[in-house]
């Protein structure tokens, strides 16, 4: 329904459904359902084990790769794009559909998050790329990539420094997922960074986005 009601927005990058940002503002019930997922106690229990007891929800998004049409997500680190200081974020990625190699599941470089280091990113000017920056190829070993295979209803959690990406969906099956972004109460959401470094078709305005204290206190 979210994709159908937003034909002008790339389905790979529907940001903010929990606040209605990706909708035409009429779908209050739809937004509430997404927010309920973000504030689910079982989800927050898992996040607490990583970030601690004070948890802030700052973003969510639906990433839908249509059959035969889904675009490439280049190798990147989320920390390159996000207005969180210090960078301490975990992403909870829930599979709506089965996410398999043939329909463009997420791929990642194991251990690339250790050391909390942002690698050099370079510009990408390709029409089939979701992002306009990616990690410089010489910065990592692509041959070590692992497919993050998930079946519908399963989830994975990854770090803000993890190098990851995904291939285009060349199969006849859609690949959709819902991702929720959390930061600890000790981090600051920097509204001075107004626009995320996504592709021209999917700019993210960070300056006025609402955030939620999901659990604990704001430190």
Task: Report each predicted region and the residues it spans.
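Non-heme Fe(II)-dependent double-stranded beta-helix
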Residues: 1-75, 80-84, 121, 193-195, ...
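Non-heme Fe(II)/2-oxoglutarate
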Residues: 8-10, 155-157, 161-219
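Short, surface-exposed loop/helix-turn segments at secondary-structure junctions
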Residues: 14, 77, 126, 130-142, ...
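Short acidic/polar capping segments at secondary-structure boundaries
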Residues: 62-69, 79-80, 87-88, 96-101, ...
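Short edge-strand/loop segments of extracellular domains
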Residues: 67, 109-116, 175, 181-187
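A generic structural micro-feature
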Residues: 71, 84-88, 139, 170-174
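Short, conserved beta-strand element in jelly-roll/cupin
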Residues: 76, 83-101, 149-152, 157, ...
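Double-stranded beta-helix
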Residues: 99-167
